[in-house]
UniProtKB/Swiss-Prot annotation:
Record keywords, A-Z: Gas vesicle
Assigned GO CC terms: gas vesicle; vesicle membrane
Function summary: A minor component of the gas vesicle, might be involved in nucleating gas vesicle formation. Gas vesicles (GV) are hollow, gas filled proteinaceous nanostructures. During planktonic growth they allow positioning of the organism at a favorable depth for light or nutrient acquisition.
Transmembrane segments annotated in the record for this chain: none
Protein name per Swiss-Prot or TrEMBL: Gas vesicle protein J
Phylogenetic placement of the source organism: Bacteria, Bacillati, Cyanobacteriota, Cyanophyceae, Pseudanabaenales
Length: 126
């Protein structure tokens, strides 16, 4: 008439969770670790370290507004492209500076309307 009581297994929060599952949850939610370390002798503080560590997935970091790796040229996949572009710009600036120096040597610089300089070019007509 009465049912026999059978012992039931105790359920824990880690049942069926592997390391990969836990890591996925941590990266999905994000975790912040904060700490302060101070080294002092007597009342003189010698060293103070403030540690703030955020562990999160890239998607979660972007969601909370952290995306510094996108603008850092050393971490970007476009590093080579940016370096090549910078080299081209430097070469162009050098060329323009040489042309300006040559113009100053052969042309006359006068003050124009409202005091802005303009160049009078001298050409050799053949």
């Amino acid at each position: 008439m009465s049912q026999a009581l059978r012992p039931q297994a105790i359920k824990t929060s880690t049942t069926g969770s592997s390391l990969a599952d836990i890591l996925e949850r941590v990266l999905d939610k994000g975790i912040v670790i904060a700490g302060d370390i101070t080294v002092s002798v007597g009342s003189v503080e010698l060293l103070s370290i403030r540690i703030r560590l955020l562990v999160a997935s890239v998607d979660k970091a972007k969601e909370i507004g952290i995306n510094w790796w996108e603008s850092d040229p050393y971490l970007s996949s476009r590093t080579q492209e940016l370096l090549a572009s910078n080299q081209q710009l430097l070469e162009r600036v050098n060329l323009l500076e040489r042309e300006l120096a040559a113009t100053k040597a052969t042309g006359v610089i006068k003050k124009g309307v409202l005091g802005t300089p303009f160049f009078i070019w001298f050409y050799d007509l053949v």
